[in-house]
Amino acid sequence: MKRLPLRTLMRALAILLAAALVLLMPALVSRQTAPRLPHAENRTLLRVWVTSSVGGGQAWLKEQLKVWEKRNPGVMTYLRTVSPEEVYAENAVLPDVILYMPGDFTAPEEIFSPLSGELHAVEPLLRAGRWRNQQYGLPLCYGAWVLAIDSAIEPGNAATPAPTTLLGRPAATDPAQATEEPGFPLEAASRADIPLQAPAGCGLFTLSGLLTERPALPDDFATLTASEVYSGFLSRKYASALLTTGQLTALTSLTASGSGFPFRALVPREIITDQVWFASVVEGASEAAASLLSWLTSAESQRALTKQGLYGVRDDLRLYAAGPEAQVETAAGRALTAINAYIPLADAQAAAWQVFIGREELAGGLLPLL
């Protein structure tokens, strides 16, 4: 059989390729012109800085940022944790939104723009974000303080959390009827090596109201961090300890799963807290900043706070049904006092100590901090 010349074969292949391109051209054009989501370079970048957060707050925030981005495909967020000093650094390029705790900033007018419009938060929390009659901080969520008591010193009164639907907590139904709880077991606690421990700070306002009589206090009382106190109580080093509500939720979950131990919690009749997480908008921020803050205080977003044992800022939403969490929510509805976000931390801690040791009445100690 006679073989075709190489030149003839090349011509045939060229004709076939040309025909294939003609057939595929409509599909290629259609694929190139199909609508697509905005590329990163065409999306608005919203920068969010966090200088400090309430326990569990960052986990909630990251989850909510993902949801908000999906609902706003033209915007992407960049989350960064910084120190308050970095915000004031020379030549710092400030973000659009800053999230912080009380004491991080003492001159909000130098950094933040006043907020306006409808703000979905209860008045005691909004008031804590005001400075010189301007609303600089929007409260996003808050925690509180409770006194946890180990079952080892009073096995008859300890409460083992029952299995429930979410992290050892009841599902959100009608709040259970409150019952009278026994007070602090002074005699039983006094027999322990370390009867009571508490971290430094404004939790002492709460502790002073929970104790009518006090056991002997350790030398390092009110000098530790909240994390150190929680670790000590978890290892059963302390007979009782002042914990944040987020720590209480974590301990409840551990106990319900068999990793913790029975305990009970004393909840104050009124909530006094410095555990409020604020958000502020920086001057010149993107318009998307307002949309983000609205989402974070929406009912849908606030419901997710239960995963972290935190409390919502809205007056039209109840998150907990029973247990200490519900008692805290009820107490906050009765009376809620939040330390002003822009008071120096040292001033707030000193005032709380003066109230705890009895040198100042509660009202007098709180007044300069509001």
Say what each PLM segment does.
Residues 136-140, 145, 158-215, 235-239:
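Extracytoplasmic/periplasmic solute-binding protein
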Residues 217-285:
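Extracytoplasmic/periplasmic substrate-binding proteins
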Residues 1-102, 303-304, 364, 370:
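Conserved N-terminal structural module of periplasmic/extracytoplasmic solute-binding proteins
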Residues 277-313, 317:
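Bilobed periplasmic-binding protein/Venus flytrap-like ligand-binding cleft at the lobe interface
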Residues 145-149, 279-280:
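Short glycine- and hydrophobic/aromatic-rich loop-to-beta-strand nucleating segment
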